[in-house]
Each structure stands twice: as C-alpha cells, then as structure tokens.
Amino acid sequence: MKRAIRDDASLTAENEFSIKLAGIPIRVHALFRSTKEFCRYYLTEEPPLFEVTITMERIKKIRMDAIVCDLQGGRKPQNYTDNYLETLVLLEFVADEFLSRNILLFHGSAVAVDRKAYLFTAKSGVGKTTHTKLWLNNIPGTHVLNGDKPFLLFHEDDVYACGSPWRGKEGFGRNEMLPLAGICLLERDNSNHIESISYQEALSVLLFQSHKPAQDARMVTYLKLLSRLSSVPLYRLGCNMENEAAWVSYKGMAER
C-alpha cells in the first residue's frame, strides 16, 4: 500500500513524476518543473511505494533552516531560490522515509572501481572533492558513484552505496548501486598514510555525516542502521593533495 507524505497544497499534474532511488520507486508532487529535470536520471514508470508532496510552507521552513545554518557557520546567508530549496525538501522527506526501509543518507563522496564503492567523508573544506579527483586521475577504471550524498542500503549482511540526484557542485555521479567496500575518514596531513580504525573510533564522524530524522520516533531506527556500518571496513586517511594520496588510499583499502 502506498503511504502519502504530504502537506496541504494542491498541485498541477504537470509537476508530478516518479523516481527510483536505492531501489525504491517514489511518486513526487512538485511545485517546479525544474525538480523533475533535477531528477531526470532517476525517473521511472514503476508503481510508487510512497508519495511526497512539496508545499511552499515546507520550502519556507527549509529556507529559515538554511539561513540559521549559514549564520552558525560564520557565513553570510545565501539567497537560495525556491527551485533549489524544493530539491532539499524532497531530499529531507525521502531520507526520513527511507530509514524505515533500511536506507541511510550519508554525506560523502563515493568512488567506484572494480565494481566496488569506497566512501570518503570529512568535514567541509578538508578535501573530499580533491581526493575524489585524484582517484579519477590516477586509479584506472575509477568513476564517481555519487559526489556528495549517496544513499546506503542495508540488505541482509551487506551494505550498498546508491546513487542519487544530489551529487554536489561538480555533478559527479551515476544511477547505480554497488557493494560498499570501505568508508574512509579524510584528514589533512603533510604525508600520506592510512590505517584501519574501529567503529567506535569512527562513530563521531559517522554521526555527524549521516542524516538524522526530523522525528524523534525514528531516532532508534536511525541509530540501529548506523550501528550496522560496523560491518563495513573503516579507515582513517591522512593525506595531502599529491597524486600519491590516491595510491595510498587505494592500496590501503582495495588491495587488502
């Protein structure tokens, strides 16, 4: 049975479409045609498992949230367009609903080689994008599964990295799903070195970089999903911006 997630607005049919993310078909009732274009690589005709309806009230709320976030980060508040904010509302709705379907939204750059995905994560400005480009330029056969916000699908004992339309400023990404072979926490350093770390050592970063539900009732589900990342090999990489950094992380994860 479909479950609707909707506010109180009525929408025109021309802005209705379906997308498939992490194997889940979703019906979207959008306000702007640009949102369908934003999701163009994920469109589907499959019957949806749930629906999302976006309203101006939700867009206004997320605008205020974005302003607060900018101010807290010491940045001048940006004049975000309603079209852009609608994509964030959609992401928030989907990420919350996905928790009950064993899918977690994660902030990081997922690169792929040899049909396996490796997820790099770090605080903003540390160099996820730079390190991703080093892999593209140095590791043969590498491509980017998602450059900013992949979904992580938990299925039985396995974890899969899944593409999404939210691919970051560079637009790196593909609509595919691959086994997640490692999560790597990036730190700046003068030399390049990588080490395996425990789930407890990685926990503070995993908490910070994963999507937390807006509803308290879903927090237990979120924490249970997060704990399942303990089954994924975890690493800490100290790196600079030289080509060697890509080889150190590749050999430290893919060749183990």
Where are these regions (language model features)?
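Conserved lysine of the Walker
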Residues: 128
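Hydrophobic positions on the alpha1 helix immediately C-terminal to the Walker A/P-loop
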Residues: 131
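A noncatalytic interaction/capping subdomain that flanks phosphate/NTP-handling catalytic cores
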Residues: 1-124, 134-145, 151-256
